[in-house]
C-alpha cells in the first residue's frame, strides 16, 4: 500500500511511479492505500505497519506482529489469482545499513514466512519469493550486486517449478504457467 503523499507526489509530477506501481497501473489495476491497510486488504512493506505510525503520521494504523503479517499475506493472497507483495526495506538496508541491520531484516523475513506457512494451503497455489538484485549480502559497498539471488518456492508443484528456474528471467514463465497463460508468441 502507498500513503496519500505518494499519490499526491505522482499526481503533481514531483515523482514518477516506480516499477511495481507502473506495472500495476499499466495493467489497469488500482494501487492500494491507507484504507486498504486499515481494512486488512494489504500488508505494509515493513510487514508490521509500524512505519506508517512512526514515520508517516498514521496514528490509527493497526500494527501487526511479524507472524500475524505472514498469516495476513497468505490470507490476502488466497483471494487472488496473482498477488504481488513488494518488500523494499531490505534494499534500503543493503544500500545504507550495516551487516547487523541486514541480519535483523533477514530474521524478520524468516519470522513472517513462519507465520505464512502456518496457514498456507497448497490449494492457494504457488508461493514464490525472490529479488530483482542483490545488495544486502555485500556490505563492502552500497550498490546493487550481480550475485545470484535465491528463490524460495512452496505450494502446488513447487519442486517442478523450482527445476524450471535458473535465474530471474525464468520467473515470468513460471508465473504465466501457473496462471494458465502459456508462453507469449514473441518468445
Put a short name on every predicted segment:
Residues 87, 129-133, 153-155:
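Active-site proximal loops enriched in glycine and acidic residues that flank catalytic Cys/His/Asp
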Residues 93-111:
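Active-site-proximal segments of metal-dependent phosphoesterases and phosphodiesterases across multiple
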Residues 69, 73-76, 105, 109-112, ...:
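Alpha-helical packing segments of well-folded alpha/beta enzyme cores
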Residues 93-94, 136-140, 160-161:
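Short active-site-adjacent structural elements
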Residues 143-178:
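Substrate-binding rim/cap in mid-to-C-terminal beta-strand-loop elements of soluble/periplasmic
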Residues 181-187:
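Polar, surface-exposed loop/tail segments
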Residues 106-144, 175:
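Metal-dependent active-site segment of extracytoplasmic phospho-/sulfohydrolases and closely related
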Residues 1-81, 86-93:
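His/Asp/Glu-rich, glycine-adjacent segments
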Amino acid at each position: 500500500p502507498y500513503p496519500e503523499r505518494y499519490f499526491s507526489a505522482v499526481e503533481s509530477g514531483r515523482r514518477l511511479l516506480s516499477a511495481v506501481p507502473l506495472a500495476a497501473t499499466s495493467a489497469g489495476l488500482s494501487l492500494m492505500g491507507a484504507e486498504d491497510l486499515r481494512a486488512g486488504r494489504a500488508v505494509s512493506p515493513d510487514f508490521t505497519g509500524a512505519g506508517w505510525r512512526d514515520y508517516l503520521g498514521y496514528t490509527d494504523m493497526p500494527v501487526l506482529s511479524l507472524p500475524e503479517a505472514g498469516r495476513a499475506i497468505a490470507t490476502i493472497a488466497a483471494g487472488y489469482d496473482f498477488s504481488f507483495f513488494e518488500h523494499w526495506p531490505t534494499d534500503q538496508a543493503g544500500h545504507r545499513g550495516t551487516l547487523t541491520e541486514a541480519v535483523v531484516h533477514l530474521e524478520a523475513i524468516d519470522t513472517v514466512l513462519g507465520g505464512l506457512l502456518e496457514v498456507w494451503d497448497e490449494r492457494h497455489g504457488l508461493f514464490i519469493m525472490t529479488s530483482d538484485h542483490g545488495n544486502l549480502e555485500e556490505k563492502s559497498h552500497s550498490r546493487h550486486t550481480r550475485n545470484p539471488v535465491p528463490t524460495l518456492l512452496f505450494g502446488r508443484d513447487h519442486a517442478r517449478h523450482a527445476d524450471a528456474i535458473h535465474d530471474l528471467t525464468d520467473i515470468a514463465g513460471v508465473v504465466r504457467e501457473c496462471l494458465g497463460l502459456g508462453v507469449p508468441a514473441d518468445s
